[in-house]
Amino acid sequence: DLRNAEAKAIWTPTDPSNSKHLWAPEIHRINGKWYVYYAADDGNTDNHQLYVLENSSNDPFAGEFVMKGRISTDKDNNWAIDGSVFEHNGELYLVWSGWQTRRVNVETQCIYIAKMSDPWTLSSERVLLSKPDLEWERRYISPNGQKPGHVIYVNEGPQPLKSPKGKYIHIVYSASGCWTPYYALGMLTARTDANLLDPGSWEKSVEPVFKQSPENGVYSTGHNSFFKSPDGKEDYILYHARDRVTESPSSGETRSPRAQKFVWKENEYPDFGSPLPTSMKLPKPSGTKSK
């Protein structure tokens, strides 16, 4: 019941370097502590970096979140957003969206991975897994001609997803401009016995794995995450989308969060189906307790 759930401000920035444009917070439980990963800047969005908060309390609503610092993703401190972590074979990994080099006239967001020595420190060089080189990943102009002030090609919002039988690790990411109806999900896949820091271990989907549905009146489907039903029997995708085809680049407030169930194919690849209309009533996730 997100509408009526308790909300709490857990941290307020005091350092000007990370006091503006706080984006995409994620909370993770790692080694008995809570960690929040988020991106922020000093007021210039070209300076976005990743930051980490830590809370040693068992209850994230109790205790105190303290700043562990900025994650240094590369020696040049290139733009970095949308950090997410996952554990595999006893190792901790970070995936995120970043620039190869500082933007001049064209902005290109790519997907990176690195190994971590602890929840706020990388122990390997960043490895490029994907850049927006497919046509459906490079759309930044809306159907009515609206576009940002410069060219933007997007791969962002990477989310790890392990297959149910443990054969694959999928990284589902968002591509194209979120202000366009073309915002969609792509997927990178590696076998769990592969070297995850080897770009050759990853296979990239040629087509979107989840995209707009004009027939259902749903557009700009992206920046997702995953969760299970209370009894662990069902898988759900959480994403944001719009009910309109066209928006201006600054009108993100029209996006709304949506969730729906997805299934697994026999080959251990997810089948997300199509985004459902907001007018459709869905059954509660399996195991939901009645009030």
Predicted regions and their residues:
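Carbohydrate-active catalytic/glycan-binding domains of CAZyme proteins
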Residues: 1-291
